[in-house]
Design a protein with these regions (language model features):
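Cytoplasmic membrane-interface regions of multi-pass membrane proteins
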Residues: 24-29, 93-109, 174-183
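Individual alpha-helical transmembrane segments in multi-pass integral membrane proteins
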Residues: 1-56, 71-85, 145-157
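Membrane-helix interface motif
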Residues: 51-63, 135-139
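Histidine (H) residue identity feature
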Residues: 55, 94-96, 207
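Intrinsic-disorder/low-complexity, polar/charged segments
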Residues: 1, 30, 61, 109-110, ...
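Juxtamembrane/interface segments of multi-pass membrane proteins
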Residues: 1, 58-73, 102-110
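Alpha-helical transmembrane segments of multi-pass integral membrane proteins
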Residues: 35-41, 75-136
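C-terminal transmembrane-bundle signature of multipass membrane proteins
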Residues: 88-92, 113-212
Length: 213
């Protein structure tokens, strides 16, 4: 891969993860000072890793193994990646647990409650995938260089993508299944099942999460 293409792809990846940091902060901990510090710290680790990788590649001799000369900076950047996904998992599962309590009392929508779980599941799968990549890089290997790493990373990536799809683009069959599992007196229960999906009140993840805090 050419250096410009590598740099652009890595920068875009880091931008995407920075936006996930921002999303988790704004949705779950908008007013928490520690959350702002966490976002800045995580983005700082990613930026430091990128700068370190660029420096290592530019100054390394042509015959050097890129995986070896960049393993330190890659690991630093992966710390920022892992912080984002682990925080995402913790917030998702924490608010899912709180949502289940409200769901039992008929105070929330089963679809919203499930989205918290899916968001947490995405974070857990992505955290595990990042951990594999970080350890492999630290040992001087390439995550894509062996089936031992590619197979679990592929499974984890597919699980993370599925969780994101179900959370943000829930198909009708999945929504119906969630409603069938919900307590009868909850939002989305028997009363909502009699109404067309388009006529049901839409509860945003942002508003729901704030109500649970």
């Amino acid at each position: 891969m050419s250096f410009p293409i590598w740099f652009i792809s890595t920068a875009c990846t880091q931008l995407g993860i920075a936006l996930i940091y921002a999303f988790t902060w704004q949705v779950f901990r908008e007013k928490a000072t520690w959350a702002k510090v966490l976002v800045v710290t995580g983005v700082g680790f990613m930026a430091a890793g990128l700068v370190g990788m660029v420096h290592a590649l530019v100054t390394a001799p042509p015959s050097a193994d890129s995986a070896l000369v960049t393993r330190g900076p890659i690991f630093i950047g992966m710390v920022g990646y892992a912080g984002c996904f682990l925080w995402t998992a913790l917030e998702g599962f924490h608010h899912h647990r709180m949502a289940l309590r409200r769901l039992a009392l008929g105070l929330t929508d089963p679809i919203v409650a499930n989205r918290f779980f899916l968001w947490g599941l995405f974070g857990l799968m992505a955290s595990s995938l990042t951990a594999i990549s970080a350890v492999t890089a630290l040992l001087g290997g390439r995550p894509s260089g062996t089936p031992i790493t590619m197979l679990p990373m592929g499974v984890l990536g597919a699980a993370a993508a599925t969780a994101m799809y179900l959370a943000f683009f829930s198909p009708a069959w999945y929504v119906g299944w969630l409603q069938s599992q919900a307590p009868k007196d909850s939002l989305g229960g028997s009363k909502d099942r009699a109404r067309p999906r388009s006529a049901r009140p839409q509860v945003s993840c942002v508003h729901a999460s704030r109500a649970f805090m």
